[in-house]
C-alpha cells in the first residue's frame, strides 16, 4: 500500500460562537477503500466531468504513477457531520515536500471537489489543512479557468495563507451541439472539410474493403483492447509509459456505459482506433491512433465522422470536447476554444516555500522587461 509519510489525522479549528464553524481535516493515504460519503462526493463531481470521479482517480493512482509517486486524498468536514465538505486528491514524490493535485499527462481537467453550496469557507479550511502539514508548495492543474471554482480556489488559497500564482496550461477545443442533428452539424463545417470527409469515406469503404465498428462493452471488449494496443504501438506516438492505464480506463468506461471505442478495419485488419468517452451529456475525444502503414487511407478522418454521427444522433450529447491542445485539425471539427490554467501556490511558513514564492514573483516581474528588451533588440 502506498502511504504518505506524515500524520494522517489533524484538527483544524476556526474559533467562534457557532460549533458548525469548526473544521476537521484529514489525509487518507489510499484511494482504494474510501467511505461511501467520499465516493458519493467524487461521483457527484464526476457528473460534470468523468475525470473528477472516484473511478478515474483510482485507475490513475493504481495504473499511472511511478513507484516513488504517492497518491492521497485530503478532506475537510464540519465538526458536526461525517460528510466531507471538500476533497482534494493529491500526489507527491517520496522524500519531497512539494505537493500537487492528483493529475498527470493523462489528465485533461482537475478540480478540488466541494459539496457545500457556499464553497469558499470549505476550500479555505481545506487549504489550511494542507498548509499546516508543512508542504512547501502546492500545484493544481489543469483547471477550468472560466469556471467559478477557479476564482474560488485562488481566493481560498490566499485566505489559507498560501501565496498563489495562476499560469496558463493549454488550449481546449470544444463544441456545444445546441440540439443539432449530425447532418446539420456536418453542413456547418467548412466546405473543404466536408468534401475531404466525403471523398475519404468513399475511398475507404469502396468494394467493402473498409468497415467501421463501435465497441461499447460485451464480448468484443477484450479483442478491441488488443486491437487498440496493437494500433497504438504501430502509430507515430511514443509508447505508453504506463501500459496498464489505458486498458484500465477502457474497462472502467465499458462498465459505466461510457465507452465509445471506434475501430476502422481494412481488408479485415484493424488500422485505426479512437477512444471517446460519453458521460452525462458530454463526449470527450480521449485518444486516437492509426497504423502508419495505412496512413494513405485516412482512416482516422473516416472514424472521426463515424463517431461524431454516433454521439450526436444516437447519444444526443450536449457538448463534444477535444480535451488537450491546439492541434490544427481540431478546429476543422469543433468551433469553440477555451483555456485551461493552473495555480502554483507556496507556503510562506517554510523557508523553501518562501524562497519559491520570491523566485516566482521575481520571474513574473522580469518577464515583461525581458520581452520589451527582446523587442527592442529585434528592431536594432
Language model features by range: what are they?
Residues 135, 207-209, 259, 317, ...:
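Short secondary-structure junction motifs
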Residues 21-99, 142-172, 176-296:
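A conserved beta-strand-loop-helix scaffold within acyl/acetyltransferase catalytic domains
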Residues 29, 116, 216, 344-347:
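Residues at the C-termini of beta-strands that transition into short coil/loop
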Residues 111, 185-186, 235, 292-294, ...:
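A short, structure-level motif marking secondary-structure boundaries and short turns
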Residues 71, 85, 92-168, 280-337:
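Acyl-donor binding region in acyl/amide transferases
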Residues 2-22, 155-184, 188, 315-380:
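Active-site/acyl-donor-binding loops of N-acyltransferases
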Residues 5-6, 12-15, 89, 106, ...:
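Intrinsically disordered, low-complexity proline-rich regions
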